[in-house]
Amino acid sequence: MRQVTLDERTSLGEETSKKLRSNLPPGGWFPALRDLSWYITERNVVYIDLFLSPHLQKISIRAAWSRNNPDIPPAILPTLVPIISALPTSSLERISVSTNHLTMPWARFKDPLSSVILRCGPSFTEYDSPVPLSNAALDHLIHLPHLRTWRIHGPPPTYPASSLPLVFPPLRELTLGENAACGWLPLLKRLEEGASTTQRMTPLSKAKEFLKVLKIEDVFGINIGASFVSAVQRFRNLVSLRVCVYCHDRDDRGKCIFELNDDNVTELAMALTQLESLVLGYPCSENTCLTTVTCLLPISVHCSKLNRLSIHFNATNIADDLRNILENPRFQQLRSLPRCPLAFLDVYRMPLGLHGSDLEIVVKGMIDIFPSLAHCEGVEEGWEEFSGMIGDLQGYSK
């Protein structure tokens, strides 16, 4: 057997598990097991070691507890930690850890999981886990030549300028989770700018070529401004960029951390021309940000493959801004170029409050920017009428 899935319904029973343990053959019950998906519960955690194989390549751990009983069972952690520490690593390729528990004490797993990572070899390709790792484990991952998927939580190791890593893995997907972006984005910039060689190769050369998906799930400690654009735009082959920013995300001055303006967004769009999905913050419900509907035109023109968009922008003067796009000569050349195939626009809680002729101007302006637009999803006043008017003007009913 090469694949086993243990879920919340799996229970061998106490007698059966005792017999399995007492009669455990020298090579284990599953000597050829390659892929183990393990949904941890009080019932199955005590015999999970019976399913481990020295040839294990992929392990997915999900700590799933009942919503009716959200407290972590006290017996789970002391049992689980030593089992994780003992995971075989000679052929391990993938570690995935997740939970439905909002207060999972991930720090308890830092040392055992770090010890596992430090034993992983060059065949390791994926680390997808909210468990923080030691500096040594992080440095080890940085030097793994075939790492493709990495979810990072916490800051990077501290590297003096004279000892920056000379390599960085050829990642295809990078997720910056809790407290990660504020440290890792500057490090990536340092790797690119401070370690260039006469061969024009840098530690980021392969990552710049291969990275397709970048997700920033936690913006704590950073401002989404010009320096953010500078750090991200180097990954020119991205097909998906997701930056989770809301109006209530504030810096220590009480200001919204989303500081991009229309020119910044244009610069980003001109760099990331392969994007198919762009979530650049969630639409602003307070209309306080500097970006306006004007930035949507360069996005539509330069990101010609885009089919999903959500962006933080100010709709206070949306009708006037759209008139400006239609009438201002400086937009004439852009308006003559083909647009992206975007059909759906998520406007979240962005206020609109327009009706009648003013609303029609906005709808026509948005269709001019996104000719394939079929629907706008918004909960505030005016957006339902907006979507209905799109259908009328595009020649079909919604």
Put a short name on every predicted segment.
Residues 1-398:
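Leucine-rich repeat
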